[in-house]
Amino acid sequence: MADETKATLGTADILEVMKLLPHRYPFLLIDKIIEIDGDSSAIGIKNVTVNEPHFTGHFPDRPIMPGVLIVEAMAQTAGAICARNQGEGGHLVYFMTIDNARFRRPVVPGDRLEIHVVKQRQRGNVFKFHCEAKVEGALVAEADVGAMMIPEGQ
């Protein structure tokens, strides 16, 4: 049964992620999506490396991934769900709200950030997602994010 379920789920390597999201280095924060279930959920991966530019100042002697970038990685994973299900047609996903953000422990270079996103609701082109970021199965951050999908150029 688990194999059947796994077969219905999609994935996205970095090239597919780059087709789904307009972000580019240094602000593309998702390396791949290991699981995407229609328009309801996804698991994104961010491999945290010391070579990322924010670590030069946050903090020089003890590099910690800024919480706002963890939330941005959550929003990008949610955006990939929206974009993938929109199909062709030139739409952009705008991050609208963040609620209930909690940061449980630092994320440091060498960590593999696993971002779990579940759609809570959708009304027209407005979406609400619950997001959890984990390292080695331990919850490091969580938030509820809102997004809006609009046609490009508006």
Swiss-Prot record:
Keywords on record: Cytoplasm, Lipid A biosynthesis, Lipid biosynthesis, Lipid metabolism, Lyase
Pfam (any one): FabA
Cited Gene3D superfamilies: Hotdog Thioesterase
InterPro entries: FabA_FabZ, FabZ, HotDog_dom_sf
Chief localization: cytoplasm
Subcellular location: Cytoplasm
Catalytic activity: a (3R)-hydroxyacyl-[ACP] = a (2E)-enoyl-[ACP] + H2O
One GO CC term on file: cytoplasm
UniProt record, GO biological process: fatty acid biosynthetic process; lipid A biosynthetic process
Cited SUPFAM superfamilies: Thioesterase/thiol ester dehydrase-isomerase (SSF54637)
One MF annotation (Gene Ontology) recorded for this entry: (3R)-hydroxyacyl-[acyl-carrier-protein] dehydratase activity
Enzyme Commission number(s) of this protein: 4.2.1.59
Broad class of enzyme this protein falls into: lyase
Active site annotation, chain numbering: H58
Family membership noted in the UniProt record: Belongs to the thioester dehydratase family. FabZ subfamily.
Function, as annotated: Involved in unsaturated fatty acids biosynthesis. Catalyzes the dehydration of short chain beta-hydroxyacyl-ACPs and long chain saturated and unsaturated beta-hydroxyacyl-ACPs.
Alphabetical list of NCBIfam families matching this protein: fabZ, PRK00006.1
Protein name, entry field: 3-hydroxyacyl-[acyl-carrier-protein] dehydratase FabZ
Organism: Agrobacterium fabrum (strain C58 / ATCC 33970)
Organism ancestry: Bacteria, Pseudomonadati, Pseudomonadota, Alphaproteobacteria, Hyphomicrobiales
